[in-house]
């Protein structure tokens, strides 16, 4: 997250997003939450902006947004403010204007990223900040991906996503590649996606005899073969794809298109709806940008360094 327009009473925070380089669903907890094993990769684009201003209206939190159909009463920012003030008794009167640039319902973690930004701001401004361990615990209570955005570094996430192990980008063997993200005009609710997965698997946990905890040994592919797709390899998979693609067939078409354009891998991010491709050369993405622009489909690209 990046701070700008910083003053004693206001600031603007730019928040990035994430993609899942893989996503395995490894169990279901008694409370219905799902255990995962996933690689989270933070990205600077697309991004949101939070303009936070301290007011004198004794109103608690006032939230507004440039997207009209985003729910404000039940928003994750409201939840963040409520839980932090309850834990610390720090109740600043603030107004937040949220400028959405990250498509929501796209599996990019925009809401969790915004929550982490607000949580960081509250922590920095609180006269009685939480200890690091309590802050992480509160972040996980807000949302499973929020602890990751507090770190904002490549991580292997386990548990419900709150147990994080930092990973060097160089160890993933993807430095120098370009990530190209397609964000179709389609919103997929994460709870609905998990329900579809549960129904598809008849409450049985998906397992693979090829999958084990030594995942870090498998962050590579045969660079000598130009036709090799990363998606042929164990680690770049997403357990949501069979169920999501059966319901939203257009997403499987996007994946196939990315592979036809020369992607070394094409994978659904999170529970969707965004699909990304990994390309060896940055200039490969310019043709795709124009191709999808003509179809009024949002795309983003980022060189991984």
From Swiss-Prot:
InterPro entries cross-referenced by the UniProt entry: GHMP_kinase_C_dom, GHMP_kinase_C_sf, GHMP_kinase_N_dom, IspE, Ribosomal_Su5_D2-typ_SF, Ribsml_uS5_D2-typ_fold_subgr
The entry's keywords: ATP-binding, Isoprene biosynthesis, Kinase, Nucleotide-binding, Transferase
Superkingdom as given in the UniProt entry: Bacteria
Database matches in NCBIfam families: ispE (TIGR00154)
Species assigned in the record: Lawsonia intracellularis (strain PHE/MN1-00)
Pfam families xrefs: GHMP_kinases_C, GHMP_kinases_N
Major enzyme class: transferase
Residues at the active site: 18, 145
EC numbers on record: 2.7.1.148
Function: Catalyzes the phosphorylation of the position 2 hydroxy group of 4-diphosphocytidyl-2C-methyl-D-erythritol.
Family: Belongs to the GHMP kinase family. IspE subfamily.
Name recorded for this polypeptide: 4-diphosphocytidyl-2-C-methyl-D-erythritol kinase
Positions annotated to bind ATP: 103-113
